């Protein structure tokens, strides 16, 4: 079975109308893509940014209804494109596939620093004797493929984590917290604003047999836990974005013991100095680090040690 796709390019002000018209016409799926090259970084809660020009793609099951025969689909495409003032539109066919398998085929094991591997749960570990972090990459952000995650994983693999308490703030899939436990940490407290991330973290901890040493919270739950358990962290990991990292600087100072270590990621080069300025009163920072390859060199990592108590 094949599916028909209708693509149209329109300004973001027309996207809502395009979605409504596609839905009314019987689309089984609608996808929004950037029509140009305008990056959008992860939004804050409640924000739903869009690109200035958007390609809206609707997928239709034209095999299930004889009314799609002949020129009906072409006429529908032209009508909707006209109503939303699309700058262009086009039609394509999409062959049916086992989409679950198709998605899974993009993930392969990743070797990080030292002896740490990230292994999708449906694949065998390339080196059974290594430290293998088994991951379901589909649950939340944090697969090991993104440079920001690998920067933190490589940093963790270089630390002595034995018997350490680690706080992973903005835990996503839980990959950093689970890695810390596999590398010897005593306990991880993982925090995220997204309930799906909290669930993903717990599930990935269970996949790796470390769920008895990892607690995952929404922020309000974490605050309540801290009230009853006011212990300070030996290590804080935060792979989020520059703006929240800057805002969290005083909180992380309060959570981290003197002499404790912190690693921050999710920064592009032109944001790094602002984050340095926010943390310098609290932390002695190392030189920013980035990978040398062209694809990932714009992502930077900051790390340091808490040495003051302002």
Predicted regions and their residues:
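N-terminal auxiliary segments of SAM/dcSAM-dependent transferases
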Residues: 2-127
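Short structural boundary motif marking the start of a folded domain
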Residues: 2-4, 131, 300
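A short hydrophobic/small-residue beta-strand
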Residues: 29, 187-188, 262
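C-terminal beta-strand of the catalytic ATP-binding
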Residues: 60, 304-308
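A short, charged helix-loop
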Residues: 131-137
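Conserved SAM/SAH cofactor-binding pocket of Class I
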Residues: 139-226
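S-adenosylmethionine
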Residues: 159, 193-305
